[in-house]
């Protein structure tokens, strides 16, 4: 079933590396929103943000493409993609190490008029706590984005 709603996750993407299983999962709050919205039938789902240039970035990009998430406003920045190393203890995820978002923490996405026009095409624009987008919130508010 398709729902007449469009969503964009603007901000974080990471790879969760589960050390006890030697397996990696793409994620991040904004990536997860786009993927789950698509799974539940949203008509248009996008992710907008920065990726690094390493294998972790390639893993997230590949997974998003497989899920048919729109990536047209993403950019690659030379360097390490966001990651966290974690394990499970008694069924709970325990974080061991992370790189503070990789390139995203050092290169803040600076929204221009074209980015704001793109975001205005969506019914919902989502960002999260670890996105390093706080400086962009006044622009989003001024543009009256949903």
Predicted regions: what is each one?
Residues 22-25, 61-63, 139-142:
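Short, glycine/charged-enriched secondary-structure capping and boundary segments
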Residues 1-24:
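Positively charged, low-complexity intrinsically disordered leader regions
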Residues 15-20, 43-127:
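Conserved N-terminal subdomain of the carbohydrate kinase-like
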Residues 29-39, 143-144:
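Histidine-anchored nucleotide/phosphate-binding helix
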Residues 124-146:
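Conserved beta-alpha-beta core of the PfkB/ribokinase-like small-molecule kinase fold
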Residues 1-4, 115-117, 139-142:
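Short amphipathic alpha-helices and their capping/turn segments at secondary-structure boundaries
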Residues 24-28, 113:
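Short, conserved loop/turn and helix-capping segments at secondary-structure boundaries
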Residues 28-29, 56:
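Conserved alpha-helical elements of sugar-nucleotide-dependent glycosyltransferases
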């Amino acid at each position: 079933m398709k729902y007449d709603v469009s969503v964009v996750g603007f901000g974080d993407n990471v790879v969760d590396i589960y050390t006890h299983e030697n397996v990696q999962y793409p994620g991040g709050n904004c990536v997860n929103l786009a993927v789950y919205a698509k799974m539940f039938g949203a008509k248009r789902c996008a992710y907008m943000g920065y990726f690094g240039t390493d294998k972790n970035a390639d893993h997230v990009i590949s997974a998003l493409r497989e899920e048919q998430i729109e990536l047209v406003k993403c950019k690659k920045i030379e360097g390490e993609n966001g990651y966290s190393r974690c394990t499970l203890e008694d069924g709970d995820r325990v974080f061991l190490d992370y790189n503070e978002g990789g390139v995203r923490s050092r290169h803040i996405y600076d929204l221009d008029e074209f980015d704001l026009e793109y975001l205005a095409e969506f019914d919902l624009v989502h960002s999260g706590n670890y996105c390093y987008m706080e400086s962009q919130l006044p622009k989003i508010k001024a543009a009256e984005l949903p």
